[in-house]
Amino acid sequence: IANSIRDEIPGTIKFIFQPAEEVALGALDMMADGVLDGVDGMFGMHVWSELPAGQVSLEAGGRMAATDQFEITITGKSGHAALPHKCVDATPCMAATIMDLQTVVSRQVNPVSPLVLTVGKVTSGTRWNVISGSAKIEGTVRSLDSESRDMAEESVKRIAANTAASYRCTAEVKYDRL
């Protein structure tokens, strides 16, 4: 559309594709390479599979949610399944942490401030007859406002630490705002 009316627009039109937009790194490389030098204005768009083909959705302000990525590493003490009293099983702690994280959206966020917390990957254990000494939870938080985003980050860290402590484990949280 813009190309068809280029003679009516003063200045130069640049069409760009931002690589690595999901992790918010592509724009930095593009700026470092000078792609945006001399640009006076910009209109950005994002492909959204939920929007029917041929339709465009325009709104003032932010349109897509901010994306954060978290990784929780839970540490207990591994050992043989025949000797559970000598171990600190990280797997039940992982399960409890996942359940406790569900309260972030249902009980801690203002219901008119959309926020999604997703646990997308869990790993624990190395063998069928060994109590797991470590577990990992990986997920994402999507938010539309900074207050909810801040609250979610604080909650993920607090829940991970407190739940781990209640299971005699420790939790290390890596939380990246992408």
Identify the meaning behind each predicted range.
Residues A2, D7-S132:
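Histidine/acidic-residue-rich, glycine-tolerant segments that coordinate divalent metal ions
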Residues P92-L178:
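Metal-dependent amide/peptide-bond hydrolase catalytic core
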